């Protein structure tokens, strides 16, 4: 897929404005809050600071494409643990959590905290976020 945009355009704006993928949110614009997290080749990446030119030939996954089979295991765990409040940070949090579980199937609390450190939640649901990640990890282990 290609879009007509300058190479220095942040990926976030291409996703939202050119492709209509509005699940990825704008939070701070400087890569500090995590609301714009997407996956580039499976790695959690801040779309607001990633120029379009850095995505050439790479696989981009947004919250809309996280699972081809309905809700992703992390999304189901999010609901089960009642994580969302306002929901604004949710897509970025889920994308970071999914990337963590892809590389660390059974993370410790410390690994979760480290991976999620760059994702801010104004509602302060950090304990539920951690619980949801543990639930998703356990669910993934049970279904293997």
Feature map (PLM): residue ranges:
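Signature of N-terminal electron-transfer/Fe-S-associated modules in redox systems
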Residues: 1-144
């Amino acid at each position: 897929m290609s879009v007509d945009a300058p190479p220095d355009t942040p990926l976030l704006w291409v996703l939202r404005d050119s492709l209509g993928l509005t699940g990825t949110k704008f939070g701070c614009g400087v890569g500090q809050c995590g609301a714009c997290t997407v996956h580039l080749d499976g790695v959690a990446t801040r779309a607001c600071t990633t120029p379009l030119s850095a995505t050439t030939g790479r696989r981009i996954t947004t919250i809309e494409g996280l699972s081809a089979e309905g809700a992703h295991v992390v999304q189901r765990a999010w609901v089960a643990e009642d994580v969302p409040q306002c929901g604004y940070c949710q897509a970025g949090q889920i994308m970071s959590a999914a990337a963590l579980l892809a590389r660390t199937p059974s993370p410790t609390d410390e690994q979760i905290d480290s991976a999620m450190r760059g994702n801010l939640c104004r509602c302060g649901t950090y304990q539920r976020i951690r619980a949801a990640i543990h639930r998703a990890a356990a669910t993934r282990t049970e279904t293997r």
